[in-house]
Amino acid sequence: VKDPEKLLRIAKEWGVETEGKDIYDLAHEMSDLAQEEYGKIRGYSRWLKRAPQHTQDLWHAAGIEPRAIDREVSCALHMTHMGNTSKPEALIRQALRNGLSDGWGGSMMGTEFSDVLFGTPKPIDTEANLGVMVAENVNIVVHGHDPSLSEMICEYADSKEMIDYAKSMGAKGITVSGVCCTSNEVAMRRGIPMAGNFLQQENVVLTGACEAIVVDVQCIFPALG
């Protein structure tokens, strides 16, 4: 837990008692509540209360308040299956509800708890270019959308054990750079340089400079397989 203050703020926002609790016990409790937000059967998304009151009132009047993140996706899939919902008003309402569950649910959840786990970003100097890879170093490029994997790679690549191992193999050190959204994650938290954007992921390999490009779950060109 890199940002315990933010965890405490979210807990207070969600009405969770924090007094006297170990920060990691609280983190596990909040994790359980956060996962319930994906499939709970009662109530509405906890994050909606962050919106201005007049916006909340508009959502309520229109009947588009998202209930749970995965629930709205499943509902939309069901409604658009053959022989189900045919009224355009109902389909549009569910589309709006589903969109809100994405932005005010899944996206906000991922952002807030990534900050809790890995630290809240702050302005930081970094570089962006294919030239950030260093010929004399072991070059590892992280790519994708899951910050958990890239954070662990950065953590271990910076360890004395791994740097000494790289040097024993003839390199001067280890350079971690990034591509696509994972690149932005490690750039804004660690200052890791950006080798390129989504469209440049194959170019990173074509340089011949990187020893490994590590991908996770999304935005991966088939050629990288």
Feature locations, PLM:
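Metallocofactor- and cofactor-centric catalytic cores in central/energy metabolism, strongly enriched
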Residues: 1-225
